[in-house]
Amino acid sequence: MPLRRITTLALALSATAATLTALPGAAAARTSETLRWKPCAEEQRQPAETPKDAQDAKGGEGAEVPELPPLECATLDVPLDYADPGGRQIEIAVSRLASEKPERRRGVLLTNPGGPGIGGLGYPAILAASGLPQEVRDAYDLIGFDPRGVGRSTPVSCGLTQEQQDRGNFPTWAHTPGDVVREAEGAREIAERCAASPSAPLLPHIGTADVARDMDRIRAALGEERVSYLGASYGTQLGTAYASLFPGRGDRIVLDSNLGPGGYDHRAMRMLARGLEDRFPDFAAYVAAHPEYGLGTTPRQVRATYQELARRLEREPVQGWDGTSFRGVTFDRLYVDANMPELAKIWQALDTGGPVPEQPPFPDVEPFMSARFAVICDDSPWPRTIREYQRDVRVDSRRYPLLGGSTANIGPCASWPRSWVKEPVRVDDQGPSNVLLVQNERDPGTPLAGAKALRRAFGDRAVLVTADQGGHGVYPFGVNGCANDAVTTYLTTGQRPARDLACAAEPAE
């Protein structure tokens, strides 16, 4: 598998968009269907369905996957188009890890690991096997699901070519205005292929608002008046959408590693570059403290090595690695502290010409990439002109020199069919005060700035807990006991911090 594919697709799994239609929220609750549970097949609960960072958060690259508890599975029919609830129906795959303590059970906890384009059917098992406190497992039935368009729910496919799949969500670095023009050609071809695909009738209807309405259908099918929620990364935007569309049906809402109130929009894509700037000093300090890598003895020298290696690989790739894949793997590995030694070895090999550590293969990613493009592009209007992206590249290359010339470059959303694009939902302070935001301060995939913006948008509905840590994902995979305890306390007792809470740094175990 080409190295660019590995790194760009890993990046595509990172930050994750909520532009929501203005259909009445109540429309999603009218269902008398119940879920018929049966044991999930083994492959339905595998960790491949969850983000790489969630799998590796405890042990880093090559960590042993814990034994997973068995799940129950069911399917739920929902309208393809909620504006036409009696029209075509599609299937949503749902899973359950039931509480084993009925006397302590207080409800259901709907979960989502992020994305978009990633299934969450196996996520309850991953949470349980990765340290979710027993008191939370006792208090809730853990509910997972594959969002529409993904996995074992009704899927979508644009029929992307291998080259289009390899592009991932990570455009090449644009050094000149002409580079943006060239990138636009490939991006437009992806949008056109999606519009001409057999999945075209489904693609306008798999955005975040549609998934949020599916979540309310799941709630109703479970027979619950209200549902609690735990969502990470892009899952925070699903939770934001649900809390905004159905404010009276949310119980305890926990959003971990937060996108801003605009979700995975054009601004969020550009903010990935800020995320790397926030996170990179942690890695630079690690490398500088380990002179055996030969990559610099001060953080400033390590940063200079990054820039020099990226330029060199763009001129002359090494073992299939170019500047784009080098930047991508750096971004990806910095999701988890435990990956820093492996990343330093990759840098060292690329610098010296030694063998690069073998990278794990990815499964078939065409459905993932198709669903990802569709959700992101459906969810909000993106700039349509090449000139706007040329301007953004010029600005971000200077502002965020580690990654800005890539993340500001043009993508398929610039050419997405206009009739498919929705307007975002309004996120405001109207509703119950039942949202807990939790966020690492130096998160590359969902930077702290997004969490602060979402906190402002929610007003008194939300409290923000920050952890003086680096990496993507806090609960329950992270090491910060203060932040983890705040989430567990809220889920089990309903008590949030009285005001925004800043948790001090804690060392990795």
Where are these regions (language model features)?
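Catalytic-loop region of hydrolases
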Residues: P2-L11, A18-W173, P177-V181, R300, ...
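Alpha/beta-hydrolase fold active-site neighborhood
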Residues: A28, R300-S433, V479
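Glycine-rich nucleophile elbow surrounding the catalytic serine of serine-hydrolase chemistry
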Residues: G119, A212-R213, G231-A243
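A catalytic-pocket lid/entrance helix-loop region that shapes and gates access to the active site
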Residues: G131, S157-N169, A243-Q301, K345-G354
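Alpha/beta-hydrolase fold nucleophile elbow
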Residues: L222-Y234
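Conserved strand-to-loop "acid loop" that flanks and positions the catalytic carboxylate
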Residues: L436-R442
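Conserved alpha/beta-hydrolase "acid-adjacent" motif
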Residues: P444-G450
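Catalytic histidine-centered segment of alpha/beta-hydrolase-like enzymes
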Residues: L464, G470-G481
